[in-house]
């Protein structure tokens, strides 16, 4: 909940005909749902660091129906809540929907945590979130991030924290409408988005197939309105190509949806067994994450080192997460690098950490987002659902990177011009892989002498 300003009582009696009408709280009962969720493991970045739905690990589960115990301690703890609820529901001069009050109380629980990755979701937001994770949803086909002038993640949209397009999905309505990487979105359907979070804006942009949303876009100093007709978006998370005269296989992952691991396995197998590439580049830049089991399977395609990473609950010891058998490129004679930046978050950081920490690949680019928690996604029947941070994930040497990120072995800061055609990071990746194939030593940057300590206080939501 947000604090509302409180005005001092007036000593003058105003003319009642000039008084504004009392706000009416929603009074229509909300439909109940009998949906039952199955247990899944997911990792998503809600836009993820700067946005992009970035980054969070999730477990989707079913509420067991248990309620807090009725001990004297709990009764004392909840007495102020029930006193306030009873007083409002019985004595508030306007109309009151008890479901609306309960929803507000649930929101308050999650807001009190101060964790942007733990959040109450309305039924619409809950469905949209799960659709985005699965790889299919109705929208326009944009991935975005909130970034400051230096390209670093930031929180709520402001004059110094702008909502920037980081990826336009192939064959999407946004691409057909002319949207480009680097575009800055300043308004949706004519309404400015200053003060909103990236999740707020994504909710505004998504909508039923066939409807139109108009984005106000700033590009190269010019402002324009771009109408886009929404459609079903099929995310194509994994693409590949052959570089350097057939010597290097390049794989780009834009997100970790339910089919990403199999898609990557198929493309990687083709690169290694059909194209006979000798080295690999895995591009995880601006990848906000997705399913956590996809991250485990994708890391297993490149290394059989054990453990890949660790998971830890609030009260338990770290538990190792093991590789799956049958990886298509676990042969360490195939050199590889991973390209990363500040938009590399959550599931993509798990893969990056597994490959860097097990000495399978060098990281090239800039420091990653720093999303080190895993969320549990649960449905509240008839009342939406929520995501709650329930576990940490740790690198192979049990380092927690939350709010800190992974530091690349070779640091290359992103260009100020997000739309410039030259890709210095990819060029460096090609250079490093070719050097390793030739047996030439590769010079890496020294590790940082000091880095911020991980914390569960709010980090920029993505």
Locations of the language-model features?
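Extracytoplasmic/secreted proteins, especially bacterial periplasmic and envelope-associated proteins
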Residues: 76-83, 87, 100-104, 108, ...
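Terminal targeting/pro-maturation regions of precursor/exported proteins
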Residues: 2-119, 459-461
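Ser/Thr-rich, Proline-interspersed low-complexity disordered segments
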Residues: 67, 440-462
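PDZ/PDZ-like domain segments forming the peptide/carboxylate-binding groove
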Residues: 91, 135-187, 191-195, 258, ...
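Extended, small/polar residue-biased N-terminal targeting/export presequences
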Residues: 90-162, 212-214, 218-227, 235-237, ...
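Conserved P-loop NTPase
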Residues: 375-379, 387-416
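Cleft-lining beta-strand/loop regions that shape enzyme active-site pockets
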Residues: 25-29, 166-167, 172-180, 189-381
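Extended hydrophobic packing segments that form well-structured cores
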Residues: 424-442, 449-452
